[in-house]
């Protein structure tokens, strides 16, 4: 058993002394930009989820370097925001010094795992040299009228002392609005807030999704969040008011099934009636704590009759109007036409309120109970009714979006200051000299007043410029601001430790050279937060011609979670968390890296098993023992060895290209078993094997590379080439078995992969029809048999 602690310490020192991971920009090579979602530097340090995600990108980064690409693989720290501030408040520490301590700890941990980051390119969002450009981008948004200060109903969290974006609010099991962080109560409150007009880019954000190699569920979440709908806005005249209620609907063909109208608690009519109706006023007040968001439909279906009627635009019948908590605020017109027979939500509400339910569509999808439109198909009726309403000036064609503008203010201390000052007329002006630095505060706790803690520093707030008194904006930006553009920040650090100006020719050249990010790896939980916001900012910068790509991240991989030994998500409350640092001490970083990659496909969530880690360590001992005790290094190798070695390389590269990292480890195991049988390996073959091993286990690979007397460093070596001619002549017959019964046999090139063999058999229509049934599992014995087990 080798001493991993000594080997890791030795090679960390050598790599540092030779600056092995230093990034060198080379325009003569094809670029590859691989990026991790950068971490929030918590006091707890790295967890296994971090290590798994960062090992994925590290393996891929090393592979592309070995293929001759100019690879950039940076790391930084998302250090502003609520998590750091809340922890600092609870522990009575300054968030700045506390965050810097955590970052140093993170860097030490990241280094111990052997990741190939170049820390010359590292950044933190709390660095004024960095957030200078966060402020610069905001300034440009302001100049483009895409940032404005508005009085708006916001999600106010008393315990956190700040406003939350819609994306940061969840609905708990009782139907109450709560904060995503901490599950604190959230209520509606009208406040003056900065908003960014992300809705301006709604169509561009939708269209861009079709060009991205992202998991389809993530793209669908963004499509649903943007929520583009084409329909009709119909005016229902109120009987006792001059005004009409505008209703957006995508199903005008159901208009004869309307038995009520319902407006949201934020609708102008509900507010107007509440001024003179105490019951309505009480209902609206009660609903402030039960705000419906787009994330989850309301389950209570509460409502109250507004004691007014609307006039049906085609029948002139009177229709009761309700205020209801299931009507989504901010979508369409804040009002719906209730069609209980053809909408689940309307049905629940109608039955609860004992309202009529009128079925206007029969089982053949034709209209009934719809006067002159009876017998028309739903599509025919949709067109005919829409045209009739438009001809009477009672409707118009409309496109609406669920997406709301991004509330960008936070009433907290630990965030980027706005580059804004207000004159004596309360008119906002941009600060020209950036950055506007965040001042130190002794007391940065929110007081619940709605004012930022920065308001307490009057010496900072009040300034005089050209004999005019100004006050600084005291709200700060949300924690998502710095992460909207950090992938550009890394590029701005190339050959400039203080960042190239974002609008400089040097930065533009680097953006043109390295964008888009070729591979982005991170959690699926950021689908409608970071990933949407970053795309929005990037499209704005594209319109300004600062970047030349329409999208920032071309390919996205969501790594699966590492579950606790009990199969549940790791959490301190469950007592099933595992600290990776002691595992490095006991088993070595190489063993942990290998096990995290060998557990299964990178997108799958997998259960931690101590024995799996032990097994991986034993396998590394086998590798070590072969090279130190059993290997006979010679240039004389058999044809069988030549074929086995080239098959190992071919399959390994194929799996690496497909990001099937667990299968690469399987190929290494197969080849090592072969080596133990032959007890021989040439120096060239040793180099090829150790190069692949170095992607996963760089420490041991370096040690064995040195033992063989090969050129240092193995982590800088190019991959060995495959002799593909060997496979053009080497053929073998593979049998296809379905549920254990012979089905067919076919000739294949030796070493063919399972997916290729299966696809080849599927060329036969009869076999393809059978294999299109649900498959339980596939067992493939390479070059011999493939057995497909169908689900019963």
From Swiss-Prot:
Query: For ATP, which residues are the binding ones?
Result: 572
Question: Would you name any one GO CC term?
Answer: cytosol
Q: Where in the cell is it found?
A: Cytoplasm
- Please give the InterPro entries that the UniProt record associates with this protein: aa-tRNA-synth_I_CS (IPR001412), aa-tRNA-synth_Ia (IPR002300), Leu-tRNA-ligase (IPR002302), Leu_tRNA-synth_edit (IPR025709), Methionyl/Leucyl_tRNA_Synth (IPR015413), Rossmann-like_a/b/a_fold (IPR014729), tRNAsynth_Ia_anticodon-bd (IPR009080), Val/Leu/Ile-tRNA-synth_edit (IPR009008)
Please indicate which superkingdom the organism of origin belongs to.
Bacteria
Top EC class per UniProt?
ligase
Renumbered ranges of motif 'KMSKS' region: 569-573
The record's EC number reads: 6.1.1.4
Q: What is the protein's given name? A: Leucine--tRNA ligase
Q: Which organism is it from?
A: Mycoplasma genitalium (strain ATCC 33530 / DSM 19775 / NCTC 10195 / G37) (Mycoplasmoides genitalium)
Q: Which gene encodes it?
A: leuS
């Amino acid at each position: 058993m080798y001493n991993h602690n000594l080997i890791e310490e030795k090679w960390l020192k050598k790599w540092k002394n030779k600056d092995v991971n230093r990034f060198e920009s080379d325009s003569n090579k094809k670029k590859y930009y691989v990026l991790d979602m950068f971490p929030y530097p918590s006091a707890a340090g790295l967890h296994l989820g971090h290590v798994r995600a960062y090992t994925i990108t590290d393996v891929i980064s090393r592979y592309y370097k070995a293929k001759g690409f100019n690879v950039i693989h940076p790391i930084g720290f998302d250090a502003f925001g609520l998590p750091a501030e809340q922890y600092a408040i609870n522990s009575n520490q300054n968030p700045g010094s506390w965050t810097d301590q955590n970052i140093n700890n993170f860097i030490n941990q990241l280094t111990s795992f052997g990741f190939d980051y170049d820390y010359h390119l590292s950044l933190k969002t709390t660095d004024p040299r960095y957030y200078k450009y966060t402020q610069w981008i905001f300034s440009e948004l302001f100049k483009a009228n895409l940032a404005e200060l508005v009085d708006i109903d916001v999600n106010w969290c008393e315990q956190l002392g700040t406003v939350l974006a819609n994306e940061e609010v969840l609905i708990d099991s009782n139907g109450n609005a709560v904060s995503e962080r901490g599950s604190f109560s959230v209520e509606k409150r009208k406040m003056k807030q900065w908003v960014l007009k992300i809705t301006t880019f709604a169509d561009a954000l939708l269209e861009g999704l079709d060009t991205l190699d992202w998991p389809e569920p993530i793209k669908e979440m963004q499509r649903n969040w943007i929520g583009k709908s084409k329909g009709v806005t119909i005016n229902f005249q109120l009987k006792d008011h001059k005004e009409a209620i505008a209703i957006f609907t995508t199903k005008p063909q159901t208009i004869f099934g309307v038995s009520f109208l319902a407006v949201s608690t934020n609708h102008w009519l509900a507010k107007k009636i509440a001024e003179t109706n105490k019951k309505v006023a009480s209902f609206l007040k009660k609903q402030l704590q039960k705000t419906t968001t787009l994330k989850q439909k309301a389950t209570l279906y509460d409502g109250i009759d507004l004691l007014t009627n609307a006039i049906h635009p085609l029948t002139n019948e009177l229709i009761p109007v309700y205020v209801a908590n299931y009507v989504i605020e901010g979508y369409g017109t804040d009002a719906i036409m209730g069609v209980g027979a053809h909408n689940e939500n309307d049905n629940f509400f109608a039955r609860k309120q004992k309202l009529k339910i009128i079925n206007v569509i029969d089982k053949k999808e034709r209209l009934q109970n719809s006067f002159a439109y009876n017998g028309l198909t739903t599509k025919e009726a949709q067109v005919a009714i829409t045209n009739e309403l438009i001809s009477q000036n009672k409707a118009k064609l409309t496109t609406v979006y669920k997406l709301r503008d991004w509330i960008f203010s936070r009433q907290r201390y630990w965030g980027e200051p706005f580059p804004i000052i207000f004159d004596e007329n309360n008119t906002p002006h941009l600060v020209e000299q950036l950055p506007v630095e965040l001042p130190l505060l002794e007391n940065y706790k929110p007081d619940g007043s709605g004012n930022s803690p920065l308001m307490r520093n009057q010496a900072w707030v009040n300034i005089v410029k050209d004999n005019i008194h100004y006050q600084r904006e005291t709200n700060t930006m949300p924690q998502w601001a710095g992460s909207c553009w950090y992938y550009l920040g890394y590029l701005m650090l190339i050959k400039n430790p203080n960042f190239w100006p974002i609008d400089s020719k040097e930065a533009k050249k680097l953006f043109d050279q390295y964008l888009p990010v070729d591979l982005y790896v991170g959690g699926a939980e950021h689908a409608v937060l970071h990933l949407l916001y970053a795309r929005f900012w990037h499209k704005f910068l594209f319109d300004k011609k600062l970047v030349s790509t329409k999208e920032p991240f071309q390919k996205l991989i969501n790594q699966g979670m590492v579950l606790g030994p009990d199969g549940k998500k790791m959490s301190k409350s469950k007592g099933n968390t595992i600290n990776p640092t002691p595992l490095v001490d006991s088993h070595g970083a190489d063993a942990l890296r290998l096990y995290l990659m060998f557990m299964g496909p990178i997108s799958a969530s997998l259960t931690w098993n101590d024995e799996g880690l032990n097994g991986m360590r034993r396998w590394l001992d086998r590798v070590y023992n072969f090279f130190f005790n059993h290997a006979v290094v010679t240039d004389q190798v058999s044809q069988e060895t030549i074929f086995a070695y080239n098959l190992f390389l071919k399959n390994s590269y194929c799996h690496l290209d497909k990001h099937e990292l667990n299968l690469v480890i399987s190929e290494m195991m197969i080849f090592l078993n072969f080596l133990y049988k032959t007890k021989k390996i040439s120096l060239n073959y040793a180099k090829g094997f150790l190069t692949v091993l170095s992607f996963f286990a760089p420490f041991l690979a370096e040690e064995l590379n040195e033992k063989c007397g090969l050129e240092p460093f193995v982590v800088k070596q190019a991959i060995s080439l495959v002799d593909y001619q060997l496979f053009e002549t080497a053929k073998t017959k593979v049998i296809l078995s379905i549920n254990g019964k012979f089905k067919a046999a076919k000739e294949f090139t030796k070493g063919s992969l399972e997916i290729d063999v299966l696809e080849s058999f599927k060329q036969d229509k009869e076999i393809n029809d059978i294999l299109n049934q649900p498959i339980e599992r596939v067992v493939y014995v390479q070059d011999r048999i493939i057995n497909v087990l169908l689900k019963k």
